């Protein structure tokens, strides 16, 4: 089993302790009932990574679990950034020549949830209701979106600053990527990589990484 944690948990001060607890809680025998049928699963090994790392492997590894030569060249010889614009958090990661650059790792609680809060100053709706409206295209974000967009770009400037100039590629995932795509394109230009499905990219990347590491057995 491969588990992708928010980067603040995976790489924070208590990261190793959190990873150990996750492994201890998930490894072993699990049983549950679904549709009145009892299910059981034996988990032999648990690997823990960060959510931006899952997005990275979605970019680097193909559906067969292989890292093509051109992607190996980027992974081993280039600098690139990963930006995840999720519901709760904005997460940033930088990899250089195959290694994580820890000083440019960041996680901020300013994800799409923050946009919804800006749309709801009098708290007339729950976040769940606003999220449903947003997904259905029924939420008016005209006034709030520019402010949230500035906040996101501000976080990028704060945590990445001039290192952006070294990036060969910037991988952007999460539902927020759809909302400020034009601003991201203006900032990163042809270095921007937006997956065909930014919302599922992290989960898909974890699956690809499992194939890459363990094969199909």
Located regions from the model:
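Short, glycine/acidic-enriched loop or turn micro-motifs at the edges of active sites
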Residues: 54, 87-88
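Conserved catalytic-loop position in the HRD/HxD motif
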Residues: 82-86
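Short acidic-glycine loop/turn motifs at beta-strand connectors
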Residues: 96-98
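A mobile "lid/hinge" subdomain adjacent to the ATP/sugar-phosphate binding pocket shared
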Residues: 112-148
């Amino acid at each position: 089993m491969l588990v992708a944690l928010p980067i603040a948990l995976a790489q924070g001060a208590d990261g190793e302790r959190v990873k150990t607890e996750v492994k201890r809680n998930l490894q072993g025998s699990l049983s549950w009932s679904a549709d009145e049928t009892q299910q059981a699963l034996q988990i032999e090994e648990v690997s823990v990574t960060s959510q931006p790392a899952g997005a990275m492997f979605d970019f680097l590894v193909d559906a067969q679990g292989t890292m093509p030569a051109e992607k190996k060249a980027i992974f081993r010889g280039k600098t690139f950034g990963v930006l995840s614009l999720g519901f709760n958090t904005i997460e940033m990661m930088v990899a250089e020549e195959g290694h994580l650059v820890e000083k440019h790792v960041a996680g901020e609680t300013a994800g799409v949830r923050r946009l919804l809060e800006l749309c709801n100053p009098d708290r007339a709706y729950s976040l769940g209701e606003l999220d449903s409206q947003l997904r259905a295209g029924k939420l008016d974000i005209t006034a709030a979106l520019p402010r949230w967009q500035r906040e996101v770009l501000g976080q990028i400037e704060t945590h990445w600053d001039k290192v952006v100039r070294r990036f060969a590629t910037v991988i952007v995932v999460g539902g927020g990527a759809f909302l400020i795509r034009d601003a991201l394109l203006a900032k990163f230009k042809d270095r921007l990589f937006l997956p065909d499905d930014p919302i599922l990219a992290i989960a898909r990347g974890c699956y690809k990484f499992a194939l890459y590491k363990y094969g199909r057995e």
